[in-house]
């Protein structure tokens, strides 16, 4: 799992069959931008939990879905500059 920050929505209307019309978000993973399927309805500025690989496909709705990164949760409290995080 990854912790990422949602930067902005990504709109793609011309897609391959099977890609459906799920919402896409541009997320920041450290210093690189990635595209993730939004399975939870997040918005720019949210810190989110993302999964990759086969977990991303299942979280997007199907093992055959062509995704390698899916947002599966919105983090309620996260300070990336804090030296220690509270475990819940």
UniProtKB/Swiss-Prot annotation:
Q: Which keywords has UniProt assigned to this entry?
A: Bacterial microcompartment, Carbon dioxide fixation, Carboxysome, Photosynthesis
Pfam families (alphabetical): EutN_CcmL (PF03319)
Where in the numbering of this chain does the BMV domain appear?
A: 1-76
User: GO terms for biological process?
Assistant: carbon fixation; photosynthesis
Tell me which domain of life the UniProt entry assigns to the organism this sequence originates from: Bacteria
Q: Which cysteines are joined by disulfide bonds?
A: none
Tell me the function of this protein.
Probably forms vertices in the carboxysome, a polyhedral inclusion where RuBisCO (ribulose bisphosphate carboxylase, cbbL-cbbS) is sequestered. Has been modeled to induce curvature upon insertion into an otherwise flat hexagonal layer of major carboxysome subunits. Has not been identified in purified carboxysomes; it is expected to be present in very low amounts.
Q: To which protein family does this belong? A: Belongs to the CcmL/EutN family. CsoS4 subfamily.
Tell me the protein's name. Answer: Carboxysome shell vertex protein CsoS4A
Q: Which organism is it from?
A: Prochlorococcus marinus subsp. pastoris (strain CCMP1986 / NIES-2087 / MED4)
